[in-house]
């Protein structure tokens, strides 16, 4: 990559980081102004268009980055698990770490999931679908259950995790710890339920074939 391309990439990154830093519990992406984001990134507002077509393209890039960050973290969690950690507890603590370290990235995913922009809703749905698919792959590999079962299990788990994540954004450390414990219990219940449901279906099939 040439010097100019490196500089362009650096400025693009500055714009993304500036936009993330301006999000908060009180401030959504829709309320950000191009001028403020450019000023925070240290560039003239007119230079913004060298990097993004418009503010929406910046937002979609942020959605993609948020989803990718979360998926990469969960992959790291699975590597920790491979070294002997508890699957559910390690995954939950990794997820809560992500929210603690990147609250605005998670806020963006939550808000735009049901926001007014169809493009943003589709982008968040795609990120969540990637997340579900990766978890279903992992469950299929670990539990030796058919894809239909692992997909249903992964979808239920991700739904509960995102709901707990929304709560975790607005509570203190002690409440977050309690939330984490409750989430671990709920995920274990789903996991056990999926396992016993699958076994019951297998037993039914073996009775029919006899």
Curated annotation (Swiss-Prot):
DNA-binding as a keyword of this entry, yes or no, is: yes
User: So which domain of life are we looking at?
Assistant: Bacteria
Record-linked Pfam families: TetR_C_46, TetR_N
A Gene Ontology CC term for this entry?
Answer: cytoplasm
DNA-binding region, residues: 33-52
Localization (cell): Cytoplasm
Q: Domain HTH tetR-type: where?
A: 10-70
Q: Which GO terms describe its molecular function?
A: DNA binding; DNA-binding transcription factor activity
Q: Is the keyword rRNA-binding in the record?
A: no
Subunit structure and binding partners = Homodimer.
**The protein's name in its UniProt record:** HTH-type transcriptional repressor FabR
């Amino acid at each position: 990559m040439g010097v100019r391309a490196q500089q362009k990439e650096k400025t693009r990154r500055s714009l993304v980081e500036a936009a993330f830093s301006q999000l908060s519990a009180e401030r959504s992406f829709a309320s950000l102004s191009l001028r403020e984001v450019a000023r925070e990134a240290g560039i003239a507002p007119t230079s913004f268009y060298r990097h993004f077509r418009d503010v929406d393209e910046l937002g979609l890039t942020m959605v993609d980055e948020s989803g990718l960050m979360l998926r990469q973290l969960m992959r790291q969690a699975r590597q920790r698990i491979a070294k002997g950690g508890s699957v559910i507890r390690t995954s939950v603590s990794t997820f809560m770490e992500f929210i603690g370290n990147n609250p605005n990235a998670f806020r963006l995913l939550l808000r735009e999931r049901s926001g007014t922009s169809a493009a943003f809703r589709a982008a968040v749905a795609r990120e969540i679908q990637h997340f579900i698919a990766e978890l279903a792959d992992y469950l299929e590999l670990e539990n030796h259950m058919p894809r239909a079962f692992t997909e249903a299990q992964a979808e239920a788990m991700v739904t509960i995790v995102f709901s707990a994540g929304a709560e975790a954004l607005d509570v203190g450390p002690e409440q977050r710890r309690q939330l984490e414990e409750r989430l671990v219990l709920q995920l274990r219940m789903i996991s056990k339920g999926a396992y016993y449901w699958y076994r019951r279906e297998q037993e039914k099939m073996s009775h029919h074939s006899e």
